[in-house]
Amino acid sequence: RPADIPSLCLLLREAYAAHIPVIILGMGSNVLLPDGVFGGILIITRDLRNIEINGTKATAECGASLNSLILRCAAADLGGLELLYGIPASVGGAAYMNAGAHGVSFGTSVLCLEAYDPRTDRIVTLSNEELAYAYRKSALQAQSTLAVTRLTLSLNPTPEDVIRARIREVVHRRALSQPLALPSAGSAFLRPCESLEVWRLVDACGLRGYRVGGAAVSEKHAGFIVNCGGATARDVRLLMDHIRAAVLARHGVTLIPEICIFE
């Protein structure tokens, strides 16, 4: 757990020079790590959580939680991200995958982003245009060596009480629709298109509650895979494979994992 950005860069530089594989995690959401021993370095960025507000802009380090950022912005009467409240992501992870909910995408608010490149031992700055945000996508996903360090967001002046009312509504909706009582990696698959919801496709295959080992399709929301106890990465992968095969056979739709799977 690096204590600051220079320490993170040093660790990444030395790992790259020694050809040691690295996995970087913020909050660990939407990630499936391999079973057994990982033969590399696992970096946790949660101590890199500084947030600064300047006018209508907020700058946050990669390990800051998305919820903390939203609340800090709310206290400064800055909105735009509040519908994302409750997503258990770090700021870096949200930027990497373009986290979204309720029609709002994180990337829309990103003004620019700093990322360390161990190949050149430099921190590069990428504009919103260069990040090429799309549905759950960013240019970062094609740049395997870049590590997000800090980013700046452009926000909208909004009264704090309005923001907090929206947050309360989002929290209520999540509690009603999502399996928050059980561990999960979040939404298992990307929505194939705007008109197709994954949970409906899975439900039509009769897979709600279907189980492989300790992993199961959530009874509450068929778009989630939950850990009912003792689930392994293999359980989750086998269940995802079964779901994909069933949906393809019934609907002719190929589901793409939203979970980032490390082999």
Regions found by a protein language model. Give the residues of each.
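Gly/Ser/Thr-rich helix-start
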Residues: 27-29, 40-41, 64, 87-94, ...
